[in-house]
């Protein structure tokens, strides 16, 4: 398999073993790369190990490699076949989006009651422990988590993965805090040395930014988040920092903004079977959530 940080690729990891692969068939989901990056091209080690046939499921959308492997390997007398299937394309949904738009794949979650309230006045949680475990699993599958200072100040959440066996997966954290109102001594400060934590703000006050920098936060300055283009510029900045998949955990107000501007690739809705009526509350209207149902 491909290494966790994306390098080396699966082909190189497999063929680097001390095994005689001469005359073997190689099966891989993605077209073997032909370009130099952090590691040499996978086609080089395929040739070196004297592979006879290469079968792959999907043309790499990366322009540096796209549809180049077949010609390269054919020139080296290695048979190559693209086994086309929608399953492979579905598997690489995030990657395709990254390469097409140079933006991170954006997902979010929301928990709702049966009558579409996102807040229970009498209980902290809307859904059950199983839903929470799924949410933690989703965190582990993304490069970073994005929340807002408003949500964090209310919930005081660690925003990490706390599933046994996945504890080491601590996605970096981005906090949207336009006016630098994040509280002091939050639980998440325990993890600042173990993961990168960014504050996205429009506040240029030197004393305030210095205060947060001393605590270990990294500051990202933006103009605002009023228009769709503001959001896209923020996502471009996050993408340039190396984050390819982001997971939003925010309140309904911010989630509405993402939906309104059509910026979400995936929305996970956790809904229980309870009717809250007077015990239910929303910190924003539901019209954009209802629109995509």
Regions found by a protein language model. Give the residues of each.
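Residues that form generic nucleotide/phosphate-binding pockets
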Residues: 17, 91-98, 138, 211, ...
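Proteins enriched for Cys/Gly/acidic motifs involved in redox and nucleic-acid/cofactor modification
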Residues: 81, 85-111, 117
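Short low-complexity, flexible loop/linker segments enriched in glycine and/or proline
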Residues: 69-71, 94-98, 161-162, 263
